[in-house]
Amino acid sequence: MAFLPQRNFVEDILANNYNLNNGTTAFTSTNIAEYNTFSIQVNTTGLGGSNRFVLEQSNDGSNWIPINEDIYVLDLGSGTLSIQKADFSGKYLRVRLLDAGNGTITIILISKR
């Protein structure tokens, strides 16, 4: 029996075309604590400023804490963030925009099982 290599695949589109203003959030409804490994891809369009945002986690969907101290900047409007499983103890993830501006954001979970 041949073993197929494990590969990345798009598991869920967690948030699609959220309209964001300064300080607003897009968050998941999927319990991502169930995944073995994951990375997050964020695509933004039409946002003003430098597209800075932070990642936050929650166990209950209401009390949010930062995953780490990093502030992410997407100058080109999209990017893949490497979130290690060890860095994440919550069930839910959200992206909180720090810059003023309007636009949309899509969050995609890319997972290996």
Can you say where each PLM-predicted feature lies in the sequence?
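Transition segment at domain starts
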Residues: 1-35
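Solvent-exposed serine/threonine-rich low-complexity stretches and specific carbohydrate-binding patches
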Residues: 11-14, 66-76
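Exposed aromatic-hydrophobic patches
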Residues: 27-30, 79-86
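Aromatic, loop-rich ligand-recognition surfaces of beta-strand-rich domains
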Residues: 28-50, 109-111
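Conserved Ser/Thr-centered positions that define the repeating blades of beta-propeller domains
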Residues: 57-58
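Edge beta-strands of jelly-roll/beta-sandwich modules across compartments, strongly enriched
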Residues: 101-113
